[in-house]
Amino acid sequence: MGGCVSATPEEREAKTRSSVIDRQQRQDARQYENTIKILLLGAGESGKSTVVKQMKIIHGDGYSQTEXRSFKSVIYGNLAASMRVVLNAMEKLGIPYGNQASQEQARVILSLSNSLSSYESFPPDVTSAFISLWRDAGVQECFSRAYEYQLNDSAPYYFQNMDRLLREDYVPDEQDVLRSRVQTTGIIETSFRVKQLTYRVVDVGGQRSERRKWIQCFDDVRAVLFVCALSGYDMTLFEDGKTNRLEESLNLFQAICNNKFFVKTSMILFLNKADLFRDKITNSDRHLRLYFTQYTGPDRDVEAASRFIQSEFMERNLNKQKIIYPHLTTATDTTNIKVVFGVVLDTIIRENLEAANLL
C-alpha cells in the first residue's frame, strides 16, 4: 500500500510563490479591464492642455484656491507677453500711439522679463502702464488687426479682464486658469473615475521637439483623442514660421490614425477653438479659400468651412473600416466640453466592449 509523499519545503515555497503570482495576474487583469488609457495628441497650440484642465474641473475636484493661486505668475506672464506682442506689432504695422505718454509706458512693458515665473505681482508703475496702454487708441487699433500677426488666443480675455487681474487681492478663478498658457513639455498624466471606470489621460507636448516622446506612451492605449485648432487655418507654426498650422495637424493626424499601434484603437477627433474659428470666418477677410485652394464653398459660411476641414481629416484615414468620431469643441467652454466628453466616454466604452465581443 503506497503512502503519500509530502512536498519538500522548496516545492511548498514554489507553490506559494505561484499562487501569489496567479493572484497578482488576476488582480492586474481586473485593473486593466477597469482602467482606460486615453492618449491625448495634437500639434502645439491646439488646446490639449485646456482639455485636460476641463477634465479636472468636470470629473475631478476642480481647482482649490491654493491651486488657482499657483497660476497667478503664469497669467501675469501671459498678460505681459501678449501686450509685448501687440506693442511690437504696432511698430511693424506702422500704427502710432494715441498719445505721447504711451510711448514711455510701452517701454516699461517691453522691459519686463520673458520668464513666466517672474511675476507674483506687478509694481504700481507697471500696473498703470498696462491699464493706460489698453485704453490707448493706437493699441486698440493694433489689437483689432490681430489677425495680421500671431497673438495668444487668451490675450482678448486677459486684456478685457485687466482691471480685475491687476487688483492687489487678485486670486485666479477657474476660467482664468483655463485661459492660462504654458507650453507642455514631457508627459503629463491625469486620472479620474466615472461609473466605476478609471480613465488615465496622457498628455504629451505637441511641439515638434516633443513628439519623439510620444512612442513611449503607445502601450495599452484604448483611445486616442486628437485635438486640432480649427482657427489655425491661416496661421503658421511658431517653430518655423512658414508651415501652415492646419496642414501640420492634418499630416500629424494621418500619421497617428494610420499607425500600426492604433489599428484597433478608438479614434476621437476634437475640432477645437470653434469659437475663434467662427469669429475669424465670419468677421475677417482671411477666407479659407486663400489658404486651402481646394475649398470651393462660400466665404463667411462657418458650417461649410468646418465641414470642409472635417472632410479633410476624414480623408487622411486610409483604413475605411476604422471609424473616426469628430466633435466641434471650444475647450475653454466647460458646458460644451462636459457634453462632448460625456459622449466621448460612452463611445470609448462601447468600442471597447465591441472589440471584446461583449456587445
Swiss-Prot record:
SMART domains: G_alpha
Alphabetized UniProt keyword annotations: GTP-binding, Lipoprotein, Magnesium, Metal-binding, Myristate, Nucleotide-binding, Palmitate, Transducer
Gene3D superfamilies: GI Alpha 1, domain 2-like, P-loop containing nucleotide triphosphate hydrolases
Region (G5 motif): 329-334
Domain G-alpha: 34-359
Residue ranges of the region described as G1 motif: 37-50
Region of interest (G2 motif), residue spans: 176-184
Any GO BP annotation: adenylate cyclase-modulating G protein-coupled receptor signaling pathway
Protein name, UniProt field: Guanine nucleotide-binding protein G(o) subunit alpha
Lineage: Eukaryota, Metazoa, Porifera, Demospongiae, Heteroscleromorpha
